[in-house]
Amino acid sequence: MGGLSIWHWLIVLLIVALVFGTKKLRNIGNDLGSAVKGFKDGMKEGETPADAQQLPRSGAVDVNAKETTRSDSNKA
């Protein structure tokens, strides 16, 4: 008597389906599945090494080009 049997769970499921309706429960299931998928994709994206990620080239400074310009101006 202390535990819940399968019949208790079926009655609870039936009451929940009557209260919320099957369409609402289906939407909740779809939203939950999308959230889990998004979380897994985010975790996979976070596991990629930092040096493997492509950094944007805009605003990047080429250090070697600056050094060669300095050495060329000293020769003149």
Swiss-Prot record:
Domain of life: Bacteria
Stretches with biased composition (Basic and acidic residues): 64-76
Keywords per UniProt: Cell inner membrane, Cell membrane, Membrane, Protein transport, Translocation, Transmembrane, Transmembrane helix, Transport
GO molecular function: protein transmembrane transporter activity
Region (Disordered): 40-76
Membrane topology: Single-pass membrane protein
InterPro entries tied to this protein: TatA/B/E, TatA/E
Subunit structure: The Tat system comprises two distinct complexes: a TatABC complex, containing multiple copies of TatA, TatB and TatC subunits, and a separate TatA complex, containing only TatA subunits. Substrates initially bind to the TatABC complex, which probably triggers association of the separate TatA complex to form the active translocon.
Protein family according to the UniProt entry: Belongs to the TatA/E family.
Name by which UniProt lists this protein: Sec-independent protein translocase protein TatA
Organism: Burkholderia cenocepacia (strain HI2424)
